[in-house]
């Protein structure tokens, strides 16, 4: 299992996002809640079959979930999106 960080939503977001969607390896995009004092906690998991369309859709769902949590959470937590592959 490999986790790749694609986007980290911090209190001050860095501009820009870019990664390659042309792969055929199935996996999942995972939203993790992270803080400096606790272990990362999995909030959501969006699986994909590896096709560009399915992967793009799963990533979009994960980003929307992370952004909504970051916007409405009163705590100083980070919600980060990772891709898990075999």
Q: Residues of each region from the PLM?
A:
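A short, charged, amphipathic alpha-helix used as a generic interaction element across diverse proteins
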Residues: 10, 49-76
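Short glycine-aromatic motifs
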Residues: 19, 29, 67, 72-82
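Short intrinsically disordered terminal tails
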Residues: 1-4, 80-86
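Surface-exposed loop/edge segments in extracytoplasmic proteins
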Residues: 38-45
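Short N-terminal "domain-start" leader segments
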Residues: 1-38
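Intrinsic disorder/low-complexity segments, especially N-terminal tails and targeting/processing regions
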Residues: 32-33, 45, 83
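Generic short amphipathic/hydrophobic targeting helices enriched at N-termini
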Residues: 26-27, 39, 59, 77
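N-terminal compositionally biased or targeting/leader segments
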Residues: 16, 59, 83-85
